[in-house]
Curated annotation (Swiss-Prot):
It comes from the Eukaryota. This is Uncharacterized protein ADAMTSL4-AS1. Residues 119-129 have a biased composition (Polar residues). Residues 87-100 have a biased composition (Basic and acidic residues). Residues 1-129 are annotated as: Disordered. It comes from Homo sapiens. The gene is ADAMTSL4-AS1.
Amino acid sequence: MWLWQDIQCCPAPPSAPPRALEPGRAPPPPGEGLGAGIPSLSPPQKKPQSVGICVRQKGRQKAGLEKGNRKKELRQANCPSLRPQRKGADTRRLPRETRPTKKRTAAAQPFLQLWNPAPHTSNGRTGDL
């Protein structure tokens, strides 16, 4: 005798295998029958599908759109072609001083030639090339 057969709350399983359905008999409805109380044998239920967008996401989406619009307005305000011209706007802004770009000094050249000598300065050695 099995341990779970001693417990009164659990009914004993049927000792005989289930009979095949007779030709004129319909199968039991899904809520009744052999595997009615066991969740693994019950038919799978569909999860409720959400229709649309929830309120929290909607609020975030709206805030994102407002933020994007603010950024767009700021971008347009910073761009002179999209910004409406005000009188004296160009005269107030002083031109930036332009500095000459850094030129390569000659001191860096011998260092480069030590590691990778040019072919015309190889002093007749042909094995390096």
